[in-house]
A protein has these predicted regions:
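Extended redox/cofactor-interaction regions of prokaryotic respiratory oxidoreductases
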Residues: 1-70, 80-88, 156-252
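Short, charged helix-to-loop "capping" segments that act as catalytic/coupling loops
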Residues: 24-25, 91-93, 265-269
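Glycine/threonine-rich phosphate-binding loop and adjacent beta-strand/alpha-helix elements that clamp
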Residues: 82-107, 117-122
């Protein structure tokens, strides 16, 4: 870890905001978000906001409005992908390569490329070695010692680093474990007090006839939570619906297309239309991620659907002790039929 924190603090973002509250392992005073809408991508945004309130400064570098941008102290407008160059990047695999992205159209509305924003900040902070004024200078700096010039990218935009794909033989195909193989039970984790193959424990089940496990998901039309306000995509997928099993919906008096209200233990979350189907487990309901926006600048997405992350009360506490990931399908909601609205 660059910050010298040990394996108990393995660079997990949701833990960083705990440090803003507790000061452990060190105080965190500012957060600079680069195209990351944290208030939609992590569970329980209300609890997360209470932690963000402890910070002195929040900066959002973004191409679009979002709950995080609206909450930030400063918003730095980022040029969209086609309007910005990027630093050289690498692609791994059987035939690794360097690649370059160039600007296709001129930026609008005084937006800037990511490198322009970061180099501008470096200049203001007196970090002259990082204060590049031209993307070409960054590219040449990156290529120092490689034997390549930037003209090598002119033909196709990428430079292969191997003449052909390199396949490993079975004898070479080992894993970075003590045995070199897949280990169902890890001795390394066991030595640190973690059982990697514990006895099976049945998951918690709904406790009432109107209670369901809520499952979030994605759609091919949208990218995470970043495109629901897009003028074209919002026409094709303007809101989300609540998938609910046919038998459970009948017991609750809910028909396909009815308005339903979603509630957690802390109260109502929002309303959306029901999609009655046999294609879901009877104990679960499903909704697409990225909706239920309350940011007034997002005029197309504002007030449409329900935010799945708002259904995940205490979700920042449900962490896998080994991998560190948050459990997003561990939460329950209650569903009831709602009155029709004009």
């Amino acid at each position: 870890m660059a910050d010298k924190a040990d394996w108990q603090q393995p660079g997990l973002l949701h833990r960083a905001f705990d440090a803003a509250v507790t000061g452990d392992p060190y105080p965190v005073r500012a957060y600079i978000s680069m195209r990351h809408n944290i208030l939609s991508s992590l569970p329980d945004p209300d609890t997360l906001r209470s932690k963000l309130d402890k910070l002195d400064l929040i900066v959002a570098i973004t191409t679009t409005w979002s709950p995080t941008a609206d909450y930030a102290d400063i918003v730095l407008p980022l040029s969209p992908a086609l309007s910005r160059e990027s630093i050289l990047a690498s692609k791994l695999g059987l035939k690794p390569q360097f690649f370059r992205r160039q600007r296709a159209v001129q930026p609008r509305f005084d937006t800037r490329a990511d490198w322009e924003i970061l180099c501008g900040l470096a200049s203001r902070l007196g970090l002259d070695k990082l204060a590049f004024s031209r993307i070409e200078d960054i590219w040449n700096y990156q290529l120092e010692g490689t034997g390549l010039g930037i003209e090598a990218f002119d033909a196709t935009g990428f430079v292969p680093l191997a003449p052909a794909p390199r396949w490993k033989t079975l004898a070479e195909a080992t894993l970075p474990t003590p045995s070199g193989k897949i280990e169902a039970r890890s001795r390394l984790w066991a030595a640190s007090g973690h059982d990697t193959l514990p006895p099976y424990t049945a998951p918690e089940r709904p406790a009432a006839p109107d209670q369901f496990r809520v499952i979030p998901g994605r759609a091919a039309l949208h990218t995470q939570a970043s495109t629901t306000n897009n003028p074209l995509l919002s026409e094709l997928a303007p809101t989300n619906t609540l998938w609910i099993h046919t038998e459970r919906s009948q017991a609750l008096g809910i028909a396909d297309g009815d308005w339903v209200e979603v509630c957690t233990a802390t109260g109502p979350v929002g309303r959306l239309r029901a999609k009655v189907t046999t294609g879901i487990h009877p104990e679960a309901v499903f909704m697409l991620h990225g909706f239920g926006r309350k940011t007034p600048q997002e005029t197309r997405a504002f007030g449409k659907g329900v935010a799945d992350e708002a259904c995940m009360v205490s979700g920042l506490e449900h962490e896998d002790p080994l991998g560190g990931g948050l459990a997003l399908q561990k939460h329950f909601v209650t569903i009831r039929k709602a009155e029709e609205t004009n």
